[in-house]
Swiss-Prot record:
GO terms for cellular component: cytoplasm. This is Cell division protein ZapC. Keywords: Cell cycle, Cell division, Cytoplasm, Septation. The keyword rRNA processing does not apply. It is found in: Cytoplasm. Its main location: cytoplasm. InterPro entries: ZapC, ZapC_C, ZapC_N.
Length: 176
């Protein structure tokens, strides 16, 4: 696991119109989040905070249990989740893209399944409230409908009645 450092800084890159995380002299993470999506605090306090570091490590340790991703992928997922949680403005719910979950098994994990008219895919819940959850797309590309898609790690808010549990046999089939 890449250890968080007080030297890490969030960078608002006008050239790329993206939020970057400067990890060291040789490494930067380019997020899919555009500058207009960022909170004002991103511009005022660019340092990776203790709160950022704690959340990053919590997400990393949670995801490692699934044994689905290599350490570099875990780091990338965790850092993008941290950016969404602390650097993005609130996103509006766009639940109409997703089918309601009508099953009886409740979702108890933060890695969930969402199903659009075009496909099903895995998402990570970054923030949860009683009505809705902010999630990031874990697939390379997730087709919402014929015209719209989400790039990897793009955030979307959905009503909780759209959240499908990730079934254990699905997880085990990916591990094998």
């Amino acid at each position: 696991m890449l250890q968080a450092s007080k030297q890490w800084q969030w960078i608002s890159c006008a050239k790329k119109n993206r939020l970057l995380l400067d990890l060291n002299e040789d490494m930067q993470l380019c997020t899919p989040y555009k500058l207009r999506q960022l909170t004002d605090s991103t511009f005022k306090n660019p340092y990776f905070s203790l709160e950022d570091a704690a959340f990053y490590e919590q997400v990393y340790q949670y995801l490692v249990q699934f044994k689905l991703w290599n350490p570099a992928q875990l780091c990338q997922i965790s850092l993008n989740a941290t950016a969404v949680k602390f650097q993005l403005k609130p996103v509006l719910a766009k639940s109409w893209f997703f089918e309601q979950y009508t099953g009886s098994t409740p979702s108890t994990e933060a890695v969930i399944n969402l199903t659009s008219k075009a496909q099903s895919g895995e998402f990570l819940i970054v923030e949860h409230s009683s009505d809705a959850s902010v999630c990031i797309n874990l697939s390379e590309n997730f087709q919402l409908d014929d015209n719209l898609s989400l790039v990897q790690f793009e955030a979307i808010r959905v009503l909780n009645n759209r959240v499908h549990p990730l079934l254990n046999q699905h997880i085990h089939s990916k591990i094998a």
